Amino acid sequence: MGKKSVSFNRNNYKKRKNERTEPLPRRIFKNDKPSKFKSKRKEKDKNSDAYDEMLLNNNFTLLDQEEPMVEIGSKKSRNDNDSEGIRDKGGVEISNKNDPYIQFGKADPLEPLEKPDLPEEAIKRGEPTILLGIPKREGRKTNPVHDKAVENNSDFIKFDWNSDEDEDSVSNDKSKNNESLKKSSKNEIPGFMRQRGRFFHEANEKSDSNRKRKRQAYELDSQSCPWHRQYKVEREVSRIFHQDILHFIDYITPTPEEHAVRKTLVSRINQAVLQKWPDVSLYVFGSFETKLYLPTSDLDLVIISPEHHYRGTKKDMFVLAHHLKKLKLASEVQVITTANVPIIKFVDPLTKVHVDISFNQPGGLKTCLVVNGFMKKYPALRPLVIIIKHFLNMRALNEVFLGGLSSYAIVCLVVSFLQLHPRLSTGSMREEDNFGVLLLEFLELYGKQFYYDAVGIAVHNGGFYFSKKKMGWLKPNQPYLLSIQDPVDFQNDVSKSSRGLLRVKATFANGFDLLTSKLYALASRIEREGVNRVKDFPSILSTILSVDEGVRQHREHMLKCYKNNPVPLEPLVEVDALASIDVDKLPLQDVGLQYVEDESDSDETDAAKDDLFKVNESIETNGHENFQKQALTSTGEQSSSNSRANPSKLFNISSDDSEDEVPIIEDTTASDEESRAKKIRKRF
């Protein structure tokens, strides 16, 4: 085969020189021939560009530029050679000259168009093609149009008043109407009245579809709101709301079977831990101990090791995790050693319950006793806490690491709300009968009214608000964070890690708005329909709460676990029978306050004085006897008492810090000392 002769110019020389410098594989496999795919693609793009240009110009400018023109009302074109249609430069057929779309598209917009001959049925139906003046390409058999457009109501556009559920009935109605339209008689009803008559005639059929819709809505409500039951006849919506809350609490409370399965899991984990370390003790704390847990809540455990043999190092955590996994008690194991409280997180393969194990953290045990004491004092605490926990759990705001509120923080919020409620403190309202009102006011307080930037919450000593600035808990970059003083440890801020408090606040505010609008709607419905229809009203809590399929499946799984391994059922312990601590009656030493005694010149003490003070007797050089009083309070006690804010001045907190200065040592007489001790006792 002969070689192609190439002109030896400068450009070809540079091209050949560059090819020599390229790597050998690239020179071997290089193909100078154009790709078939690219060429086809270019042709396709070229053809589509002409069609797109025609669409953009609305068939006017493109046709003006072309020589073959189609005249209106004439069968001849200027280009007789191309009788089949108009083609562009690429040979693509744009359209046929006899195509009505070109005729009407090329027409003068000021010249009225002749109405094409279309079927009478299409005119009666009022199809859009008639209104546009463009017939269909594949039309039915054409008949001359009678000049009775107004009588037949040809310009009437009908709307579909039926729902998607009644598609079959709509198609049947269309066929019946088409048959009736074909019949022409002198007594035929005009089109306008026929359409209106059809609308009223289908009222009975629509009632059937409404029944279907109501039945489906009831089925949906029973699935998402399994707690809903018929209400008792009440005229006040607050009482109806109270019934709905009782129904929800009764449904969401764990059954004895579920509680027994969790207790069995605790015993199995306890045996495994003692098998590894016989000298430690395993305790349960958290919501399981206080009976405030939801069906999908975690199980909180703590391992307390003896002083002589400490357990809880990183190595011990990994050893225990491996041991539990080896015994098939743990799956999806996570050992978190970098947190403030190192824990082991895992899931029980049998019950699918999430478990958290911590080491040497006795504060959780004290917390359980304090929460039990609050539940004994405030009957509305348990239902409100359970509803708020489920409300935040649905929105992923109940986990601290996600920026939400912990269960303990929610308990403290509800306790503070009940402690400082004006009507509850005066006894003008009972908690047991007003769960709905209290829930609304809780959402309104912490969603719309509470001043997070300056106010902190304390629940010990009857509950009070304090200034975050005076306490030293105000963060300049995040002043909106919630501050809750731990009644067990006054130096601990329970909600300091809840970074997403703005989302929590907005969620509370939206919940209040939704419930308020729902209650107003129910009140107006009672006025319209009467009190007897109250029992059929939907759930009020369904506006903010629901139970998803995962919760129902988990509860069914727990019931299956109990049936496979039945154990003797124990009745749930009543709140009054729980071990508890009342922080209002407890000595301050037991809740984390440490008393520091200052050094004195004398060792003699007065044992008859109050427990909060200790008086050291000293004799000065002048011979007079004076008493030196030393206020034995910790920094936590000082900050909580001195920075105590008046609840009535919650939103107008003074920035003056002069009140924070309290004299620690002063000379006084014995009579003055007794009077000051009485004042201090009143404050606590």
Swiss-Prot record:
Enzyme Commission number(s): 2.7.7.19
Binding site for ATP: G364, K389, S407, Y408, N492, K496
Bias (Basic and acidic residues) ranges: 19-35, 73-91, 108-127, 171-186, 199-210
Compositional bias of kind Polar residues: 628-655
Keyword Membrane: no
Residues covered by region (Disordered): 1-52, 64-127, 161-219, 623-684
Domain PAP-associated: 434-492
Tree of life domain: Eukaryota
Compositionally biased tracts (Acidic residues): 656-672
Compartment(s) where it occurs, according to its Swiss-Prot or TrEMBL record: Nucleus, Nucleolus
Keywords: ATP-binding, Magnesium, Manganese, Metal-binding, mRNA processing, Nucleotide-binding, Nucleotidyltransferase, Nucleus, RNA-binding, Transferase
Cellular component aspect of the GO annotation: nucleolus; nucleus; TRAMP complex
Recorded catalytic activity of this chain's protein: RNA(n) + ATP = RNA(n)-3'-adenine ribonucleotide + diphosphate
Claim: Transferase is one of the keywords in the record: yes
Molecular function terms from GO: ATP binding; metal ion binding; poly(A) RNA polymerase activity; ribosomal large subunit binding; RNA binding
Binding site for Mg(2+): D298, D300
BP terms from Gene Ontology: mRNA processing; nuclear polyadenylation-dependent antisense transcript catabolic process; nuclear polyadenylation-dependent rRNA catabolic process; polyadenylation-dependent ncRNA catabolic process; priRNA 3'-end processing; RNA 3'-end processing; siRNA catabolic process; sno(s)RNA catabolic process
CDD domains: NT_PAP_TUTase
Subunit: Heterooligomer. Component of the TRAMP complex composed of at least cid14, mtr4, and air1.
Family of this protein: Belongs to the DNA polymerase type-B-like family.
Function: Required for 3' polyadenylation of the 5.8S and 25S rRNAs as a prelude to their degradation in the exosome. Involved in the nucleolar organization to ensure faithful chromosome segregation during mitosis.
Descriptive protein name: Poly(A) RNA polymerase cid14
Organism expressing this protein natively: Schizosaccharomyces pombe (strain 972 / ATCC 24843) (Fission yeast)
